[in-house]
Amino acid sequence: MLVTLMKAKLHRATVTQADLDYEGSIAIDRDLLDASGILPHEQVDVLNITTGARFTTYAIEAPRGSKVIGVNGAAARLVQKGDKVIVVTYGMLPAEEARNYAPTVVLLDDGNEIKKAA
């Protein structure tokens, strides 16, 4: 049997922009994608700590070093610049492998600098 587990998360990211007119997605600094293992075009859940809103979208790459967390398209109505969010991805593993699996967790500060990655 396969079970769905958290693959990776960016914890307490700060939204830097919200663009209603862009055609969807969440733009994430390439450094943060690399640190977390989140892939461009990978499905992600975004959990807004500030408002409690939750939505699903996909990740796109923002320039390396930009510290951008930019919510685009219709989902831009669910965030405001400065909101704290959690960006989560999931994967499926056989139950036996899942018992020993550890996800990647990247904790961010208010400026989207990495405080801790494990």
UniProtKB/Swiss-Prot annotation:
A GO CC term?
cytosol
Q: Which reaction does it catalyse?
A: L-aspartate + H(+) = beta-alanine + CO2
Which EC number(s) does the record attach to this protein? 4.1.1.11
Pathways per UniProt: Cofactor biosynthesis; (R)-pantothenate biosynthesis; beta-alanine from L-aspartate: step 1/1
Active-site positions, per UniProt?
25 (schiff-base intermediate with substrate), 58 (proton donor)
Q: List the Pfam families.
A: Asp_decarbox
Tell me the superkingdom of the source.
Bacteria
Descriptive protein name: Aspartate 1-decarboxylase
- Origin organism is Phenylobacterium zucineum (strain HLK1)
